[in-house]
């Protein structure tokens, strides 16, 4: 099966490079790389006591750095965490190309962030829909059953999957068999994510 790179606002997302939020040295290095997309991370790579400082640093990077042809996405914290809503508000106001939403659970959770961003775009005279959403759609079991619905939000232009958090939710002792092949549940989730993305042309 031929794989077609997912298009973002600045072109195909053939390569994505994660940058820990708040790590200026790694950010400066990332700007010199050939990745199509830089994902500035406020979630897993930032400890709780550094969340707010990292958010401020990432906002400064977005507003001051020259990304050139690189797409700038920011993975914010989950919306049900102590930092999620503040992340969404502050980062959207800084105007990246898009937000990466982890641990989405339903279409309502995606729509809520969409509405928040719409209000910020209006307040700042930004073209409606200019800030996209990329969903990590398989980190919670309940999300797997509404992938297509979540991806149907008009602001969503990317849908991806991950096994790590889902394995934790399931209490799985392993993700792969002895041959290194994903176990059935993870293969099902990965395929479901692909089908939902194609069905919604994201």
Task: Identify the meaning behind each predicted range.
Residues 1-202:
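Expand to "…catalyze enediolate/carbanion chemistry for C-C bond making/breaking, isomerization
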């Amino acid at each position: 099966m031929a794989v077609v790179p997912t298009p973002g606002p600045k072109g195909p997302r053939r390569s994505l490079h994660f940058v820990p939020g708040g790590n200026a040295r790694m950010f400066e290095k990332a700007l010199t790389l050939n990745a199509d997309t830089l994902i500035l991370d406020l979630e897993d790579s930032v400890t709780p006591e550094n969340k707010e400082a990292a958010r401020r640093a990432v906002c400064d990077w977005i507003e001051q750095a020259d990304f050139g042809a690189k797409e700038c996405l920011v993975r914010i914290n989950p919306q049900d965490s102590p930092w999620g809503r503040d992340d969404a508000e502050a980062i959207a106001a800084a105007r990246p190309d898009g937000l990466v939403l982890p641990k989405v659970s339903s279409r309502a959770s995606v729509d809520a962030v969409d509405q928040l961003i719409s209000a910020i775009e209006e307040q700042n005279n930004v073209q409606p829909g200019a800030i996209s959403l990329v969903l990590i759609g398989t980190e919670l079991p309940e999300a797997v059953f509404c992938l297509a619905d979540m991806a149907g939000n008009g602001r969503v232009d990317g849908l991806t999957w991950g096994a790590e958090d889902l394995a934790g939710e399931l209490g799985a002792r392993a993700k792969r068999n002895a041959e290194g092949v994903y176990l059935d549940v993870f293969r099902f989730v990965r395929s479901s994510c692909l089908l939902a993305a194609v069905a919604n042309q994201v």
